[in-house]
Amino acid sequence: MRRLLVLLLCLGGCGAQAAEQGVKVISPQRLPLEGGQLALGLSQDWRQPLPGVERALIIVHGRLRNAQTYLHSGQSAAGQAGQSTTTLVIAPQFLNQSDIARHQLPDALLRWKGNGWMAGEPSVSPQAISSYAVLDAILQRLEDRKRFPALKEVVIAGHSGGAQVVQRYALSTGSHPELEKAGIGLRYVIANPSSYAYFDAWRPVAFEPASCPGFNDWKYGLNQLPAYAGGHSPAQLEQGYVTRDITYLLGQQDTDPNHPALDKSCAAETQGAYRLIRGHNYFDYLVRRHPQGLLQRLVEVPGVGHDGDRMFTSPEGQAAVFK
């Protein structure tokens, strides 16, 4: 009975406790960035030319910052799709200060405050670099035709907290003309995030705005935009976002309104009770605002709840990433 109680308690809180104590595994590779270094995992050594790589999959971890777990999920998905040799999987790791302390990591490694990396906040040391600018830097490296002469497309995918990163990045990033010039496509796969950034004050759940004063602030809305957005107006950001090629990948069983990792803030609750309905509400909102020409789609994954590995290795996940 005591063991059962410990297990039940752990389901509710051990993940968060582990995250506060620092991530277990630090990714082994490094990407130099403006006087600092990003920790990341790679499925192939990109320090040398990779003439056989046709697709790069940038896969973003969730709040536990377990980048190596997501790297392995990406590799498994590529293997099941028969595309291991032609796919470079890249898993950036957004460390925080507890990770640095736990592993006694060097000062050069970039780290963020708490979960601020999800919203594009700048790193706190050794340089102030937005987590979204990190994705820009990875894309910039992939533009190099000497290293990647056969690259055809880049897919940026994330699950849970990582999906929040991908959704907000797709919204706040500008165009990538060098990718376009090189003939390299860019797609996004957003899997089971807790929340989305809306374009205006409308929300699918009725509420009293006075009781939730930050409901329309970034990262839930477009008030108080981050510096990374570069002074663009909400209208400009929306117009850019709806031109992106995006797949919203939702687990049909991700329906627990009390899931321990679900965002239960009032700003998130205005979007729906659980992740599946929040995703449907947001996609319906997009279609109403842009009934013509939307290059986006919603795909449900049967029998899967809040599980990143099962989402990306499912037939629907493989089709979204490797179509």
What are these language model-derived features?
Residues 16-56, 64, 68-88, 116-133, ...:
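A domain-start/cap signature at the N-terminus of enzymes
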Residues 61-65, 194:
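Active-site glycine-rich loops that stabilize anionic/oxyanionic intermediates
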Residues 95-129, 261:
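Cap/lid segment of the alpha/beta-hydrolase catalytic domain
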Residues 84-99:
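Conserved alpha/beta-hydrolase
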